[in-house]
């Protein structure tokens, strides 16, 4: 694939300022987006496949009342997933941005904090175990399903440490080039859970509590599979947390995790209020229908959730490197992939609505089928909310992500539900279709309000294009992994230096040095088909990032004793470089060089 031409844009306003064109290819971004989308889809199933399968088996084996009991227990599921979900999502975002900014030690600190906090948070959740009966009585209005809710909540809370550690290990394993291990952990957890679901509920007759107990043991099995990564000496991220780094590592982790914490906490709070209102004013059928709607979101996350994982990991790294072109192409590709999936889900379930409702033990009468189909039309907007919330976090617009999630999970959800309850009680609306219209209105108005606020606050829409808000100048281009194309580097650097006022003699030395580095990569790695190069002016230094999708190879450490003519050395680059670093992250070779321009001039 030949590189495409794009106009070079300046650092403000998105207007052309340099007056020339450069070539940037999306080949690496496209291949890595597809790779991590596939891996992320499997790993995301750790959180969402288990509840979906549980609910389906509960409906088939135990009936609609058991589904309602499990639905009321969803608030406890959110508590169980809170530490692991927040840290397995926010942690990779933080380390990706830190690695992009060349802060390796802080990335280790964020990894260490993520693991410790997931474990500690899970153990603290056990403090709620004695109160399961009390909360279940409130949620179920002391009805016939009170005991089922209590038992389900007990085993769910008991699983919290296992869920947290399993999610964190899987999330960081993906970033650390261990995708197969992460997928193996997920397959083990889900496989054990599904088998034990049938054993506990059908043969041991544990009721709805059997589903929660099976999930606990499934996550424990997933941790056993991931233990080799935990004890591996080849991990990129180390258990290192220096005293002087604690505050900054915590700040980076908290910033990246704030929206995920808001998501989970707001779901817990609103879930309690919503389930109470539905139980008191709509009845068991309303709770069951809302639980099925929650499973629609889970099904969507299972099939398309790899996009969210990719935005967190690959997107965070690209933003840290200020590769806005790559970030935009990644999001565009993910949107195309996932909305095709959304369309298939909506069309398929619209046709087979009755069969789907039957699988959850619900009677598919006319009102219920109509309500379910109305809910299906909320899925495109629901997915947009998910994409926006994750993208805002990766580009450090956490306040927008928090705003969106607060509107979606608390403000609009509770406000519109109160209006819905009023319409049912005062205007005598049919309760089931009214619940469906409530779900649709919440998902539709949330992105509208958020995007309007973003436009007013930032004067642009992030998903449509980011602008560099710093004073630093950045230029990226791509070349294919062939020796004859290395000459393109000279032209790109010469134009870059001319447009930024860098003297010609400096540009010549820099061009020759980078040609040496790229030839070294191509000469010792037969699997390189594309190389991305980024030039960044930062505080008087030139930062050069060289990214390739070949096999693991460190061009800074390799010594070829048989290279008598020194065709593949980097001697000039060694003299010019002030600092240099190599990282193998997300299955890409990343070489970062810091060159003092004064040093280049003296050479």
Model-derived regions, located:
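Small-residue-rich hydrophobic transmembrane alpha-helices
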Residues: 67-125, 166-175, 289-347, 386-396, ...
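Glycine-rich/acidic phosphate-handling loop/turn and adjacent ATP-lid/helix
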Residues: 543-570
